[in-house]
A protein has these predicted regions:
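Nucleic acid-binding interface residues in structured DNA/RNA-binding domains
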Residues: 1-110
Length: 110
């Protein structure tokens, strides 16, 4: 993760902690809000290894796809966590990003 600044993981944690129930953000969108639009892969790595008390279930890929590598059960577990927040998840393990995407202002994230 040497391509990003040392504060990048903390910035990701801060953004993810603010995603409201029933909304999602994409890996690339989070990377852009954190000042490194090209770093979506790094956001995924941070999500996979980050603090478990953050709402990582609200992070999806740009097509609304759920994480195959979700700890403890892959996409099915990811879907279960989102459904518990009354988020509709398709049988293909995707969500409607057009409907659910959270686009906060930078001021909201500060």
């Amino acid at each position: 993760m040497s391509r990003v600044d040392p504060d990048f993981p903390q910035k990701v944690y801060d953004v993810v902690s603010k995603i409201p129930r029933g909304k999602v953000m994409t890996y690339g969108q989070i990377a852009a809000y954190c000042g490194a639009a090209w770093a979506s892969w790094e956001v995924g790595q941070i999500a996979h290894n980050g603090p478990s008390d953050l709402p990582w279930q609200r992070v999806v890929n740009k097509r609304g796809g759920l994480a195959a590598g979700w700890p403890g059960g892959g996409r099915a577990t990811h879907a279960e966590l989102l459904r518990a927040e009354v988020v509709e998840v398709s049988d293909e393990y995707t969500v409607d990003v057009n409907k659910l995407l959270w686009n906060p202002s930078q001021a909201t994230l500060l």
